[in-house]
Amino acid sequence: MIRRAKWVVCQLLVVVLLGSGAAAAAGGDGFSTRFVTVPAADGVGLGAMVLEPRALGPHPVAVLISAWGGGATQNVVPAKNLADRGYLVVAYGARGFGESGGAVEVAGAADIADVSTVIDWALANTAADPARVGVGGVSYGAGIGLIAAGADARIRAVASLSGWADLAESLSQNETRHGLAGLVLYLSGKANGTLSAETEKMLTKFLTPHLSDADSEAIIEWSKPRSAVSHLGRINAHRPAVLTIQTWSETVFPPDQMVSLYQSLSGPKRAEFVPGDHASSESGGLLGLPSETWDSVYRWFDAHVAGTDDSITRENPIVTRARPGTQEPETHPDWASAIGEPSRWELPPAEFTLGRDTPANGGMPLATYSLEALTGDPPTAFLPLVSRRDAAIWQQAPRTTPMHIRGALQARFTVTPPARTGTVVAYVYDVDQFGVGRLINYLPYSWKDAEPGRPLRIDLAFAPTAYTVPAGHRVALVTDSKDPLFLDWNLEEGELAFSAPSWLDIPTKGSQG
């Protein structure tokens, strides 16, 4: 009953956004709008919104898949914009969410089959062109769309906004689970949808404080078929044109996996990286605000689905926007051209006590860096308040010229752990003359079977970023052992000692002193 009521409310909102029913009937718009239920093979009904051009077909098709927790009308603004450009648009809620029946499978086999079912329905019930089909989505819809391109050769283009390529890598990095992001997804999924028994089991298992090796392996195996990298051979065989747009500071799906995916794709491709957090760059466009992110989607579909404007194909396929603030985009012919040469910073010995938190942290999932996308200001920490008993802190001399960080920072620590298990979190800051650090990047690392008192090598590969440190500022590295974002393995306190060789490699372009 509640879901039905939401469906009615959503339809009323769409009437307001797209124009009254009377206006539509009078031909005030170049397309008609209707709401349908698309029957899936297993009897599940998928709630969908269909925008069909009034002109004679056949029309290029744009299938828009809802994000986590969303329904058919979540993409109403992009749907209208695509319909205005002559597309037959079918926007639907993924099963288990919105107006759709069934249960949330997290990009399971049924979710992937649903994409083909929606395409089948469009071809059978509208003037859709089977040779011109594109699929797009934000977050959850992006992940489903990428995998579907490997299952259905009719999909000629994909727009993946804040999506993932490797689900296991998204859930955990360096033996450290993204606990707070996982909790947000679990609770929002429960509140806004119907989780399948398997999804419920895996997500609750993932949130167990001290996960067993067997349960960890079970989650990895569950994640594999839900990851585009597992279907890369079929995706490349079908050669869809793939557009990925990712934020630098993703707390759900870090951008490094999208770099790897881009480099592995053999068909037409484009990758854009912008400041912000999960889904922040596309949110304005979903609300009807001007959006360069959605403009790229429309142009990508025009080139590779409708065939009406191929100008985007003549541009450099790698687009990056540096932090902080709003900087002009930098374009590159390939990823190698986008990144800088590493400069090594040798770190002197240090030690601190494990198990106590400090003001250094990665922020709040989906909020902290979304605010940065709006204001241009990264999250900050006042470094003089970071206790040297609870963290190791290294700082460079103030810069005489700007430092243009481009690419992935790399670190190596040689530590002597006090216990068999433990976690460290490394933060890299841009620090001003007052000691206020703006967060450039961060990364956790956990060990679960170390020999106490014996040196342990820790290698960290941060997600890539583009960040310009102003002249007069300095780079600082802070390492502590607690962060609300992560489920750590610090079961007891003890002194963690850093010794040589320990270093941080910073990739820079055109930077001196």
What residues fall within each predicted segment?
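Glycine/threonine-rich phosphate-binding loop and adjacent beta-strand/alpha-helix elements that clamp
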Residues: D29-S32, V36-A40, T308-G513
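A short loop-to-beta-strand scaffold at the N-terminal edge of the catalytic core in hydrolase folds
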Residues: D42-E52
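Gly/Ser-rich "nucleophile elbow"/oxyanion-hole loop immediately N-terminal to the catalytic nucleophile
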Residues: A55, E105-D111, T117-S139, I155
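Short substrate-entry loop that stabilizes the transition state in hydrolases
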Residues: A55-H59, L64-G101, T251-P254, L485
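Accessory cap/linker subdomain of secreted extracellular hydrolases
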Residues: D84, G136, I147-A237, T308-I312
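Short beta-strand/loop motif that positions the catalytic acidic residue
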Residues: H238, L243-Q246
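Short alpha-helix in the alpha/beta-hydrolase fold that links the catalytic acid
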Residues: P240, F253-Y262
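Catalytic histidine neighborhood in serine/cysteine hydrolases
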Residues: L265-S280
